[in-house]
């Protein structure tokens, strides 16, 4: 009896479904043309994808390259732009009550200094004038972002660059692009509705009954049906592990707005904190995607809409943001019997750090590494589930970090996020470690995306460590740090020299001509004076600031729920366009 799985059936489209299809059809059959595995994707023609997510992380270029996708064509088809990092504004306040700002960059100089982590030097001596954050002293991205530079030279080809980068993209167009690529490479596309799911005596999925095409036997099923989790949750009964005790937000407003001047397009995502959540701003080539992620415990939909539109001000006229309910958490097991959940059906962590496509990518790679035969050895599912659980937990912890280290006193939302939400033991232990030493990657149990530098950037920018006295700082010298900073600035100038304006680079990639972008300020090696440490203007909020200490975190939550009737309406969706916003 043939024990080999001959067909993989994906249920659901969107970014999750089509990225899975594109990955499987390429890597299962690229070296196996004589005995290819059939890939079928079934999606409903009646349930539209809710397109929200429009940003990625710096693993994305390698993913597209591995899929054999032309980067130039991707930019044109998806109205993509470059992303060099995320700017966080108003998540904390300084000692005068003013909003602070920092950038989480995509690269860093990680060499030691005098046998020690150079972050100790920054902690003890601070940065040079105009470089008040750690990212200004160990990464070039902030300078490039402030000067609105692209990461490539005009002469660079696909996937070549001087700086690490990710993309902003139109999620709907990206899913369409992946669909075309997948079908061209042999994916069988079925437009139909799944009406019934059959199970055998073991509880395995044996067949899908389609509305128009009838019964369809299956061997291995990939559930990409979004928040509904049609197969993994509703049929197989895998429980959902709710993260609401850790993270408050459960709603989002989304709207598209035009560029005021496309020539000034920023190569970064912006995350600006408001009274009950935060606003994302993702600049595509042809428009800006923006929205408000908030908590219904502190704002009704109407209140959030008013706050959001007031924040946007003159940029919006007669805008009607759509409301998107979001469910934060994960399935207890992403692999159950002969079904594997990928995308929203597996789980969704608040989209603050653009991690959804990254998770889809890693889930599919793990499937290929643990690909079963028809016996479905339990050890494979066990390994897959343990690894994906750890991956999602590490992302969850890093998202929580942004909230539990805030020092805002101007709203109940921010006080609750800091003082009453549960902090996982894994993050508690790490924060306690940071009170005594600055960890390195070996201290992180399974580094997936956010390593010690990411944690350092956030904790230093928020002032969480400013009162800590590190024993290791006895062994460092100011002269070493001053020399390193002088070398760093010279190296930064060299690396950024010749990099074009972001808009001009996008026009070059797309093969278009237009008026050159307007540059302002003095030029240093091809980029503006603003690149040298000048901080973007923050939101001035006259509020008191409190110092956050580890002892102030409380593992409980008590607040009154605030609802309106509109919040009871569910939005039907197969996917959330890759389930990422940032």
Region roles according to the model:
Residues 157-159, 163-277, 283-291, 295-304:
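Predominantly flavin-linked oxidoreductase catalytic cores and closely associated redox partners
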Residues 324-341:
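FAD-binding beta-loop-beta segment adjacent to the flavin cofactor pocket
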